[in-house]
Amino acid sequence: DLSNVADRRSADFIRRMVYDPQNTLPGTIMPKTPMPDSWRDLVSRYLAERRGAGGEIRDPTPPASRPERPKSGRELYTRFCAPCHGASGRGDGPNAQYLPVRPTVHADSAYMSQRPDDTLFDGIYGGGYILNRSHRMPAFGLTLTREEIWALVRYLRELCRCQGPDWSRNGR
């Protein structure tokens, strides 16, 4: 709930989170969203002015070191995808109930087998709007490495127990 974020966080912290969430709060799942800096400034100012009933303003103490980065596709999925898509890929993560559109069901082999791997990569890298899907699906291209995104694609194939369409796998 960001309705009173200015009561809980300093304007500087809010700005840093909007500009570079991963370095501001190591371990956060909030991705760095591609947008012009002028928009980042507007979002930061808007949030910094959102006051509620009052409260303590505090910034978290950064950890002494960065948390270890998840290595496997499963670990990456658990950290970055499961909050919306669910731990088993059924579109039933804890955040799903708050979204206007149900997250894609990654365990649905009929649906997922129609999606080539490069399309899955593009959706993770660029966000849902790239695929004409929900704009609520954030872009992770500035948060995850290419190798991590490919590890996620491979894990999606494990969840659905399927492969992409033949035409996308036969090298044509």
Regions found by a protein language model. Give the residues of each.
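Cys/His-rich metal-chelating microdomains
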Residues: 87-88
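Conserved short C-terminal alpha-helix that flanks the catalytic cleft of nucleotide-sugar-dependent
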Residues: 76-77, 140
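Extracytoplasmic electron-transfer domains, predominantly the class I c-type cytochrome c fold
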Residues: 1-48, 98-157
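Contiguous, function-dense segments enriched for cysteine-driven chemistry
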Residues: 103, 145-146, 164-172
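Electrostatic cytochrome c docking/interface patches
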Residues: 49-76, 166-172
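Short amphipathic alpha-helical segments
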Residues: 96-97, 165
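Short cysteine clusters
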Residues: 81-84
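Short Cys/His-rich "knuckle" micro-motifs
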Residues: 92-94
